Swiss-Prot record:
It is found in: Cytoplasm. This is DNA replication and repair protein RecF. The keyword tRNA processing does not apply. Its main location: cytoplasm. GO terms for biological process: DNA replication; DNA synthesis involved in DNA repair; double-strand break repair; SOS response. Belongs to the RecF family. The RecF protein is involved in DNA metabolism; it is required for DNA replication and normal SOS inducibility. RecF binds preferentially to single-stranded, linear DNA. It also seems to bind ATP. InterPro entries: DNA-binding_RecF, DNA-binding_RecF_CS, P-loop_NTPase, RecF/RecN/SMC_N, RecF_2. GO terms for molecular function: ATP binding; single-stranded DNA binding. It comes from the Bacteria. Gene3D superfamilies: P-loop containing nucleotide triphosphate hydrolases (3.40.50.300), RecF/RecN/SMC, N-terminal domain (1.20.1050.90). ATP binds at residues 30-37.
């Protein structure tokens, strides 16, 4: 899939923008604070209905307006799709082909994106919540049902934690109802995550071995707070541990086990990647991003759109070459932001170059 056209109205520092793109590489050049990252954020927002930079929707609205409108014309294998998001102080409205979507799970996945931004370099050593978010964003695009089940899980988790904080004593019968619901939704969330990590590991290891010239292998480990011996009995084991932890959870006023506490670990040649070098971290993250692209195509039959936000300067020539080779081989529409073409040592033919200045975007040229 690829974005043929994007229109922004009152988004960040863009009062109004209408642009069309190449189905291959699109490079956006400009000084800092001109709107390059805002532009990629808009594509991300149109795909996932959320920003990767802020939770405050009001920050997305142009300073002298009260509403935001984003529309995009997306070419999928199945045909052209029009996406639209309207944002105001009353909330957000999402539409596919002018039809309002009642649930996010009906909208997300229509246009898949993979974002590679400087903050992704913190994925290995950052907080566990970053790694859970990484899993959730990918899975939500590949399997819309996952978003629905995760939403149900989080709703019941909030109910259970609220009860634990307010109750003077445990009502075993009431807690049993919440336990059953939490274990049911949570088990399905974990099953999806386990399948995803197993598939992602194979793709990521293939890319990592290519980047390291066969010197390194990459493995991923989904580490659950729920102890289970096989995937088919997660529900029973989860339910048992919730019941077992009633007193502990009541004392601590929160739920001590479940996918909301699960972790993802990375290993290079069998050693925890927390102890890897900076160069190895960059190779690991690059391998993951390329694996995301490959896996989304394998599981859905369509390519995602790749967003590279000021990361090419973080990669040496070898890693740049590997990334661009993958993009070209997989025929992935790619958006690259940069302050200079000097960092892009291996630009192929057929790219489209744009210049970004103070919230305006002007096409420079197509390189053939």
């Amino acid at each position: 899939m690829w974005i043929k056209e994007l229109e922004l109205k009152h988004y960040r520092n863009y009062d109004h923008l209408l642009a069309s793109f190449s189905s291959g590489l699109n490079v956006f050049i400009g000084n800092n604070a001109q709107g390059k990252t805002n532009f990629l954020e808009a594509i991300y927002f149109l795909s996932l209905t959320r920003s990767h930079r802020t939770r405050a929707d009001k920050e997305l609205i142009h300073f002298d307006h009260s509403t935001v409108s984003l529309t995009g014309k997306i070419q999928r294998i199945s045909g052209t799709v029009d996406l639209e998001i309207n944002l105001s102080d009353k909330g957000r409205v999402t539409k596919i082909n002018a039809l309002k979507q009642a649930k996010l799970s009906d909208y997300i996945g229509t246009m898949m994106v993979v974002l590679f931004a400087p903050e992704d370099l913190q994925l290995v050593k950052g907080a566990p919540s970053l790694r859970r978010k990484f899993i959730d964003i990918d899975l939500g695009q590949i399997k819309p049902v996952y978003l629905s089940e995760l939403s149900h899980y989080n709703h019941v988790l909030k109910q259970r934690n609220s009860y634990l904080k307010s109750a003077q004593q445990i009502d075993a019968a009431f807690l049993a109802v919440l336990d059953e619901q939490l274990a049911s939704y949570g088990a399905r969330v974990m099953e999806h995550r386990i399948d995803f990590i197993n598939a992602l590991e194979k793709e990521a290891n293939t890319h990592h071995q290519a980047i390291s010239n066969g010197l390194e292998s990459l493995s991923l480990s989904y580490q659950s707070s729920v102890v289970f011996d096989k995937k088919t009995n997660i529900y029973q084991q989860f339910l048992h541990q919730l019941e077992k932890n009633h007193q502990k959870d009541f004392f601590r006023k929160n739920t001590s086990v479940g996918p909301h506490r699960d972790e993802l670990a990375f290993y290079i040649n069998g050693m925890n990647a927390n102890f890897a070098s900076q160069g190895q971290h960059r190779s690991l993250i690059l391998s993951l991003k390329m694996a995301e692209v490959s896996l989304m195509k394998a599981l859905t039959g369509d390519n995602p759109i790749l967003l590279l936000d000021d990361v090419m300067s973080e990669l040496d020539n070898t890693r740049q070459t590997k990334l661009l080779e993958t993009v070209i081989k997989e025929n992935v529409q790619t958006f690259i932001t940069t302050t200079s073409l000097d960092h892009l040592s291996q630009l192929p033919e057929g790219i489209r170059i744009f210049h970004v200045t103070k919230g305006t975007v002007q096409i420079d040229s197509d390189i053939h």
